[in-house]
């Protein structure tokens, strides 16, 4: 019986490792360099791709900057940490904080096309903005893999700075700002715009149609969709 249990555990671990293993057929070339993902059900998934430089140190309370190039092939297999937020809302425990300021990452799901099929694809793209009152939340809340495989679309989920790190205006910050975007205080909105710019530049490499991009969200994510509708900076980035 013990030997049987050992084999069962090994089988589960091997199965899990295969399902989460990197897949050479998922290699895509972005402006930053190559990324490789993995098979998730009937889809390919890429987790934790940076779409901006980390908004830390001198980039805190600044508009997002374009991401740096990869030094080598990027293994997109792990979700990034959530953006900095109160811990109690997520865990039910009082006090404390969780997440990271280095959080401007996105995740992509596409149908599991073969390399031959990929070259012929140009499918709708949907960018999901999570909810949480612009105080809590993260891009890994839901998996859209079934929607992607059933309807042949590409879904991108994004993270953005929240609370006072995402929306904060102060005279001292305006004095230090060299651009209108830096002085705006609307850093969370600008993060979502930067994600849309990344999609515009790269999603065709995943089989997406840059002229058929939909934005949608839940709760505060819906509010942020409305903000993107109102921003001239985002006017040509979705449809």
Where are these regions (language model features)?
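Bacterial N-terminal signal peptides
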Residues: 7-15
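Aromatic/hydrophobic pocket-lining residues that form the small-molecule binding cavity
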Residues: 192
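Alpha/beta-hydrolase fold nucleophile elbow
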Residues: 206-218
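A conserved short beta-strand
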Residues: 235-239
